């Protein structure tokens, strides 16, 4: 019944747009050959059904063009609903890349019913109320004391016995050590005292030890008789001959010390058995005077050294 009504409606709709001659011929064919007319209608219906199926497989989507600020109505095939498609704007001819998955999922999420709210948390169990007679816990519990504190602070017969046997000081020292190791005692700095200031001013024992262990300072040594003789002899030779070099004067002074060993003992020179040697080859005129002056100066230096307590060589 429904198929005949739909076929008649479709034929009537098609006949409204056909010429009058074609409509008449179709009516004659339907009257004479009803079976052939029904077959022809069945052959025409499938394309219409296919078009309806295609229209059902497509979905209308709304795309916003960011170039011209226009909302576009786009028909997207069902095979491309979860892909990225390219849409051309009919207003500004711009190409838009649209992700259909992101475009359709918000509508699906909006259409879905909201999830039920989570159940509220269970209320906490009521606190047990005890009468005051059974409430054994104090409001402010005292700090836990060790056994040493109780023994040291309590005035008990045990404390008296310990003091009698000489162990009271041991317990007191243990209690003081425990108090010093507590966090409060470690955090609080010790109060400054006058004794502490005096101790800070005084040098530490370690510093005193370092001063004691320091090696003794070297005393300035007294120049030897040889050094004094050479120094005086060089000055005497340079005074007599200013043009002489220091090396030549030192060589002459060393020869005087080597050639006259008796002057080392502070003795006066003996001119009887002494061989005269020329000290300065370039000065032949004053060699006797230089020799005598050198001998007497060396003897005087040796005598002075002997008087000062210098041991002879």
UniProtKB/Swiss-Prot annotation:
Signal peptide: none
A GO CC annotation given for this chain: nucleus
Cross-referenced InterPro entries: HMG_box_dom_sf (IPR036910), YABBY (IPR006780), YABBY_C (IPR056775), YABBY_N (IPR056776)
GO biological process: abaxial cell fate specification; cell fate commitment; fruit development; polarity specification of adaxial/abaxial axis; regulation of leaf development; regulation of shoot apical meristem development
Top-level taxon of origin: Eukaryota
Name of the protein: Protein YABBY 3
Taxonomic classification: Eukaryota, Viridiplantae, Streptophyta, Embryophyta, Tracheophyta
Keywords carried by this UniProt record: Metal-binding, Nucleus, Zinc, Zinc-finger
UniProt tissue specificity: Expressed in shoot apex and young inflorescences.
Biased amino acid composition, Pro residues: 112-128
GO MF annotation list: zinc ion binding
Segments of this protein annotated with the region Disordered: 107-149, 180-221
Disulfide bond sites: none
ZnF locations on chain (C4-type): 65-92
Gene3D superfamilies xrefs: High mobility group box domain
Alphabetical list of SUPFAM superfamilies matching this protein: HMG-box
Family: Belongs to the YABBY family.
Subcellular localization(s) per the UniProt record: Nucleus
């Amino acid at each position: 019944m429904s198929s005949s009504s739909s076929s008649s409606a479709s034929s009537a709709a098609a006949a409204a747009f056909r010429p009058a001659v074609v409509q008449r011929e179709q009516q004659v064919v339907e009257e004479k050959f009803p079976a052939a007319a029904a077959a022809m209608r069945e052959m025409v219906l499938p394309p219409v059904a296919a078009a309806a199926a295609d229209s059902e497989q497509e979905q209308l989507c709304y795309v916003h063009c960011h170039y011209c600020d226009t909302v576009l109505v786009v028909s997207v095939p069902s095979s491309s609903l979860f892909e990225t498609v390219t849409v051309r704007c009919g207003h500004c001819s711009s190409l838009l890349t649209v992700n259909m998955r992101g475009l359709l999922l918000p509508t699906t999420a909006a259409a879905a019913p909201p999830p039920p709210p989570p159940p509220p948390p269970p209320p906490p169990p009521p606190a047990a109320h005890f009468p005051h007679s059974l409430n054994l816990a104090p409001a402010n519990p005292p700090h836990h004391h060790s056994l040493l504190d109780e023994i040291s602070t309590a005035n008990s017969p045990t404390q008296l016995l310990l003091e009698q046997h000489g162990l009271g000081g041991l317990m007191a020292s243990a209690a003081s050590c425990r108090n010093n190791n507590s966090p409060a005692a470690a955090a609080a700095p010790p109060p400054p005292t006058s004794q502490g200031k005096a101790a800070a001013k005084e040098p530490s024992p370690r510093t005193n030890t370092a001063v004691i262990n320091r090696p003794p300072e070297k005393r300035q040594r007294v120049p030897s008789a040889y050094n004094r003789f050479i120094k005086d002899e060089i000055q005497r030779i340079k005074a007599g001959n200013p043009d002489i070099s220091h090396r030549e004067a030192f060589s002459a002074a060393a020869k005087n010390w080597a050639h006259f060993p008796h002057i080392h003992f502070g003795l006066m020179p003996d001119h009887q058995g002494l061989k005269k040697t020329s000290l300065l080859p370039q000065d032949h005129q004053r060699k006797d005077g230089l020799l005598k002056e050198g001998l007497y100066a060396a003897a005087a230096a040796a005598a002075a050294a002997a008087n000062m307590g210098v041991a002879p060589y």
